């Protein structure tokens, strides 16, 4: 392929038969190794093109690998594909299924929406709820678990099971299957049909897997069966970059590979061609705190590079401002927009940097597309409170927040009020069936709304959350949904942050609309060539590289994230992935206050030898 291989790469490429585990650290040239190995198998006549299967996780990665292989004068006939595409091919060969059987994403969401509407469930966050159901369904299927024993998060168990049964009935009735079925049905078929199993085991003499640390149980079991006859399973991955536990991916299969295949050869690609020595050495200091891992002792190619920098800002807004300044300076120095990235822990953090770059006229790309916080139901609730305080005749606003927190105004009373000729608030007060204690709740709401009206949007929202009790409502809602209230509180915090310097409700509402519109425009750019500074989550940054990387808000509760503290090793891997995206420049930062609360420096800073405490005191 025109590239000189180092000793470890050569060892992996020249391996002939039997299982092999290639531990490939960041920037170590794993794709080159995979492609060179395929070319060598063909050159040495160990296999014909059609006897080789190369598997990866995304269609883009599979297409790129195939393109590079053909550019290197590789012959046609080698199978490059995703797990889903290959498993569907196996199912199609048995059942003759066409692609029209496969549920498209929007189609299956519509089906679930219809099921929920038929059941007359009151779901305040329908789209999020549907996403959560499918995310938990995928997790269950990837673990090959039964719905009878699976314990979902973010959705009550009984609701999950009812939806699951209705969804399965719909698929059966309409002869449909989704992406999860491709894994589970393929596993069943390979497990139960000896003829099919023998055919596919004979078909592929050599199987190569990229990003092996990301396999889930269903994928691994299918792989194990397919490779059983020839045992030429060549897997490439890095346990230190296993960051998709929420999808069922586990580093265990990689870590236990030598146990599952005692005759497996193991080689470590520990030369990072991407990052400078300084970046590599700091990243190593962090990741070596994980106990469950293979030691790799990553090294660079001798370029020490710029010092990794650190600064402490007062709060998120100041941090974003400082990063904005540094980005402007990099652009002046000739660093291209597309070679700069701000990588944060959660989607919520992106707003501050988007606002700052927008203000400076610096183009940016929001690379994660998972929801618009400014259109989240919590944002809509909070805005509804402010609008209702301004104008008691906002019937839509009152309907929205009437029982948030509980005021025990039931559907029957609401229906009765809606037959009256007045606005909804007044109608409720004059309903003949209104009980004294319900009237008291309404009086309290009216009094509270009067207080809110006299305050700035920021102080008004604080009153809604702390005095009226909206935060307690979020806590109850989270408990019912088997999820963390922290995430919902942080959304409310972010909306309050947006209100900070708004003089009135009109200005606040306009700001929410503008920010929401910016996110919609970014979403429409999906799939287009990137032209701006990349703003993305640590999960979204996997597999990418940049000359300059900023890692903001390195404080406890954010990095590592509050909800990831039980899985501290996964949080550390996530931070390691983020650090190793940097080629030349890495800038770390922390904040003294987040959403008005004092913070503590991230433990990862101490692990890399930075005494951040002295900055904080």
Pin down the residues of each PLM region.
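Accessory C-terminal helicase-associated subdomains
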Residues: 431-540, 561, 612-616
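Helicase P-loop NTPase motor core
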Residues: 26-34, 263-265, 270-363, 389-391
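ATPase/helicase motor core of nucleic-acid motors
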Residues: 260-261, 304-307, 333-457
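Hydrophobic anchor at the beta1->P-loop junction of P-loop NTPases
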Residues: 22-24
């Amino acid at each position: 392929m025109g590239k000189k291989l180092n000793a470890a790469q050569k060892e992996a490429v020249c391996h002939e038969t039997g299982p092999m585990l290639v531990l490939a650290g960041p920037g170590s040239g794993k794709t080159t190794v995979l492609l060179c190995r395929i070319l060598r198998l063909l050159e040495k006549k160990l296999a014909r093109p059609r006897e080789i299967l190369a598997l990866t996780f995304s269609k883009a990665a599979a297409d790129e690998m195939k393109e590079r292989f053909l550019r290197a004068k590789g012959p046609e006939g080698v199978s490059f594909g995703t797990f889903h595409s290959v498993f569907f091919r196996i199912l199609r060969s048995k059942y003759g299924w066409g692609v029209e059987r496969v549920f498209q994403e929007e189609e299956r969401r519509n089906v679930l929406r219809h099921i929920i509407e038929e059941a007359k469930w009151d779901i305040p966050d329908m789209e999020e709820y549907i996403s959560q159901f499918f995310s938990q369904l995928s997790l269950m299927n990837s673990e090959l678990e039964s719905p009878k024993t699976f314990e979902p998060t973010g959705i009550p168990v009984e609701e999950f099971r009812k939806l699951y049964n209705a969804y399965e009935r719909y698929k059966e009735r309409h002869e449909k299957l989704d992406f999860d079925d491709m894994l589970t049905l393929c596993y069943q078929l390979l497990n139960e049909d000896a003829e099919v199993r023998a055919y596919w085991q004979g078909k592929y003499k050599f199987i190569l897997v990229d990003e092996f640390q990301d396999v889930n149980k269903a994928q691994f079991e299918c792989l194990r069966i397919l490779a059983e006859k020839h045992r030429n399973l060549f897997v490439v991955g890095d346990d230190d970059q296993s960051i998709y536990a929420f999808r069922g991916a586990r580093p265990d299969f990689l870590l236990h590979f030598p146990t599952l295949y005692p005759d497996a050869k193991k080689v470590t690609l520990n030369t990072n061609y991407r990052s400078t020595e300084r970046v590599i050495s700091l990243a190593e200091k962090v990741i070596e705190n994980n106990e469950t891992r293979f030691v790799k002792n990553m090294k660079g190619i001798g370029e020490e590079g710029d010092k990794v920098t650190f600064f402490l800002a007062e709060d998120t807004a100041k941090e974003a401002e400082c990063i904005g300044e540094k980005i402007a300076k990099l652009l002046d120095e000739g660093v291209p927009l597309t070679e700069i990235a701000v990588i944060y822990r959660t989607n919520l953090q992106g707003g501050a940097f988007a606002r700052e770059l927008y203000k400076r006229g610096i183009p940016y790309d929001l690379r994660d597309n998972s929801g618009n916080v400014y259109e989240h139901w919590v944002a809509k609730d909070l805005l509804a409170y402010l609008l209702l305080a301004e104008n008691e005749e906002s019937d839509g606003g009152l309907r929205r927040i009437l029982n948030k927190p509980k005021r025990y105004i039931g559907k029957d009373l609401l229906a009765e009020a809606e037959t009256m000729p007045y606005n909804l608030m007044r109608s409720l007060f004059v309903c003949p069936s209104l009980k004294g204690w319900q009237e008291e709740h309404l009086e309290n709401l009216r009094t509270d709304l009067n207080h809110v009206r006299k305050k700035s949007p920021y102080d008004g929202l604080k009153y809604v959350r702390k005095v009226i009790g909206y935060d307690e409502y979020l806590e109850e809602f989270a408990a019912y949904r088997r999820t963390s209230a922290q995430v919902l509180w942080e959304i409310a915090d972010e909306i309050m942050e947006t209100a900070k310097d708004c003089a009135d409700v009109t200005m606040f509402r306009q700001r929410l609309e503008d920010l929401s519109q910016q996110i919609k425009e970014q979403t429409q750019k999906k799939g287009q060539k990137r032209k701006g500074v990349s703003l993305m989550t640590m999960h979204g940054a996997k597999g990418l590289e940049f000359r300059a990387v900023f890692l903001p808000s390195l404080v406890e509760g954010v990095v590592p994230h509050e909800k990831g503290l039980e899985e501290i090793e996964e949080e550390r891997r996530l931070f390691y992935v983020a650090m190793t995206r940097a080629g030349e420049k890495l800038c770390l930062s922390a904040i003294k206050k987040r959403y008005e609360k004092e913070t503590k420096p991230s433990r990862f800073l101490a692990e890399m030898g930075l005494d951040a405490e002295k900055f904080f005191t």
